[in-house]
From Swiss-Prot:
It comes from the Eukaryota. The gene is KANK2. This is KN motif and ankyrin repeat domain-containing protein 2. Residues 183-234, 282-312 form a coiled coil. Residues 1-72 are annotated as: Interaction with AIFM1. GO terms for cellular component: cytoplasm; mitochondrion. Residues 304-315, 419-436 have a biased composition (Low complexity). ANK repeats lie at residues 614-651, 666-696, 700-733, 738-767, 771-801, 805-835. Phosphorylated by casein kinase II upon estrogen stimulation. Phosphorylation induces the release by KANK2 of NCOA1 and its translocation to the nucleus where NCOA1 can activate gene transcription. One of its GO terms (biological process) is negative regulation of vitamin D receptor signaling pathway.
Amino acid sequence: MAQVLHVPAPFPGTPGPASPPAFPAKDPDPPYSVETPYGYRLDLDFLKYVDDIEKGHTLRRVAVQRRPRLSSLPRGPGSWWTSTESLCSNASGDSRHSAYSYCGRGFYPQYGALETRGGFNPRVERTLLDARRRLEDQAATPTGLGSLTPSAAGSTASLVGVGLPPPTPRSSGLSTPVPPSAGHLAHVREQMAGALRKLRQLEEQVKLIPVLQVKLSVLQEEKRQLTVQLKSQKFLGHPTAGRGRSELCLDLPDPPEDPVALETRSVGTWVRERDLGMPDGEAALAAKVAVLETQLKKALQELQAAQARQADPQPQAWPPPDSPVRVDTVRVVEGPREVEVVASTAAGAPAQRAQSLEPYGTGLRALAMPGRPESPPVFRSQEVVETMCPVPAAATSNVHMVKKISITERSCDGAAGLPEVPAESSSSPPGSEVASLTQPEKSTGRVPTQEPTHREPTRQAASQESEEAGGTGGPPAGVRSIMKRKEEVADPTAHRRSLQFVGVNGGYESSSEDSSTAENISDNDSTENEAPEPRERVPSVAEAPQLRPAGTAAAKTSRQECQLSRESQHIPTAEGASGSNTEEEIRMELSPDLISACLALEKYLDNPNALTERELKVAYTTVLQEWLRLACRSDAHPELVRRHLVTFRAMSARLLDYVVNIADSNGNTALHYSVSHANFPVVQQLLDSGVCKVDKQNRAGYSPIMLTALATLKTQDDIETVLQLFRLGNINAKASQAGQTALMLAVSHGRVDVVKALLACEADVNVQDDDGSTALMCACEHGHKEIAGLLLAVPSCDISLTDRDGSTALMVALDAGQSEIASMLYSRMNIKCSFAPMSDDESPTSSSAEE
């Protein structure tokens, strides 16, 4: 912006211009400017320009040249300076220049305006042009120029002294005005912006002064309180601190002076290592105490058993009984090159268990009384026999009763039943039937045959048997072991059986094999009536403990194996040479682990807080494994399942409901497994319990009713069981995966018998799955003509239903190339059209007339 050069008034005695007559004291102010009370003259255009800037109107205005108003403004030396005076107040953006911009009434210069470089501004340019024009007008009157030159030079020197640029020479400045530089204006703006920022910072700091004063007072108060507290602590705790420091100083020289201290530290380290080995927590101590108590009980039981064996009780004669005596005898008789085992105890004598005479078991030694005569030929059967027979009074002391010796037999070819072989034994007690404790796999049938009398004992077991048959004295004893049949590849021409004796150490010591001819196999084929599928591999007796929590001793494992084999044995009736009638009985005994687990679950069902999480988990796992092992195998025996159900019901009805519907990790219950194995006798027992949930779906989304579509119905009893299952459940329920019903699954797998049973139970044939398919569409797609006929025979069958693709059953049959089924559907459609009611316009007479 342009800066105005202020020329001071001439001092007294110096030549100066005369007072211009153009400024009378009482003349009116020119209308283009206004005079302030302090003697300033402000241009009205400038005031309007400032007002526009404040209002935001910064549009460039067109410069209009005004002609000088000669009538209102007097022509004089100072008349041209009027417009230039307006720049005095706002001529510079720098506050330092305002101190030298004095525009007094009597200090107006007549000429020589000082111009400085600044930014381009139309208002300033117009003012400068006006001033130059006025100077040109007065250039013709050279009055007073000589007197003004020194003063002008002095003013210029003064401006240079204060830092202002020198004035433009008269010869060139007015003719060619120089606009202000942009750099100077930018510098001024930066200074103003910096000053404003600093001012704002100072204002903010001033506002923070009261807050800082409050904080300072708070800190001073806290400092005072902490000082008082520190003084009190020093006063109270100084003696203790002094003693602590003195004790520390006394302890430092002890280790190097006394070597005994090092030994003391080593002893302390040994104690800490011992402590680290101890269990932490009351739970660990309780568990250890429980283990020790269990071991103590086992040791006491073994001690009592040893004392009982050492005792030599004398046989006593008992008075003759009033009624017939019931005699149970167990005997295992194998074919050629097999071992004959007889185990019994005298009536009234303490129970005698077969004990190990050697470090490793080599067989079962016969427990027989001395002086026994040879028994007549007997028959071998897969059953435990309980026979009612009279016993003479003289032979009362020789009556024997069976004790718990379990032997498990597994067939290598999965046949329904093994041939029954009669045999003669020199060590069999008189008046008793001999049977073998074996475990059949498929059938309850039996075929008694004559067993050859030739025997070839094996290893030490044969010699021990011969010694017992000879009537050696002393308390009888034998090897506690489990007879296990090892699976072998089935031979199409011969049936081989392999027996292995498993000692308490779990090792196999001796084995025996026998072979039977092809005729025996043909006999077995006649007894196969319940095995719908190939036999699955079932864990043997020796492998059974792997499904249960492992024991702490090998003896416990052996006892558990014996109990498991007793629970699962399935034995048909035996026939003696005398032809006496016998009654069938299946021995069932719950293991102690299963009993304790059932009792624990019963407590939990009555009170959910009665058991801890660990106890509940152990009980649940035990019951689940035992129940699934018992009822979920393909060869599960229905009578054994029924007796377990009776036992569970006797304990608690809620326990029965819980056990029957217990599911494994895949959501399958015993009913799921029994139906999938087509073991419908077990299914019948489960349904008779009254608590079986027949609509329970597994994780795959299938219920037992749906799984019936995969089973094969062989007998009429199976069909009756399936019908009972269908009546108890919802036969129209959909699977969670594809929305298929039991009828759709049976149709897809081509189970005609199951389809008939479902239709007999009024299954809905028009139910659609997630894809919109019906059972009739499934039959058309898979080409089951017979099933399609059964479905079309249902009056409610709708053949006009469409799936998601808009296809009907007829279209599906045509796409699948099933022309016969398509013709059946077409005939059904024509029959429906012929029986449909016709109007008068569609009568046969009218149609024939049209033709």
